Amino acid sequence: MTLFSSISSISNPMTSSKSSISSFGSGTSIGSNSIACGGCGGGSGGILGSGLGIGLGLGLDLTGGSRTRGSCRGNGGSSNPVNGHGGMGGGNGSCCGI
């Protein structure tokens, strides 16, 4: 089982503004050569219109050799957050970039 928490900041080349990314997630992998990714967040809009994105995700991989991406939240305004979810056993979500 893998548990991680990371906080980082990136620069958005389109708006020349700095956006913070705070990610909290846990991944559990069962099987050979499996990869589980936790959550990741961020985005140009972010929540509250401040460029801050927070992602909470849980990645579970129960089949050997497959990938599951955690859930994503970001790229939306305070009233319209955008959520994306990867499927179990080989989801192709936009999170984790692995």
UniProtKB/Swiss-Prot annotation:
GO biological process, any: sorocarp development
**Region: Disordered, residue numbers:** 1-26, 68-98
Point out the signal peptide segment: none
Q: What are the Gly residues biased-composition ranges? A: 84-98
- List the InterPro entries: HssA/B-like_chaperone, HssA/B-related
Q: Name one Pfam family in it.
A: Coiled
Sorted alphabetically, which PANTHER family does this protein's record hold?
HSSA/B-LIKE PROTEIN 1-RELATED-RELATED (PTHR31059), HSSA_B-LIKE PROTEIN 1-RELATED (PTHR31059:SF5)
Q: Which family does it belong to?
A: Belongs to the hssA/B family.
- What name is this protein filed under? HssA/B-like protein 50
Q: Quick one: which gene encodes this?
A: hssl50
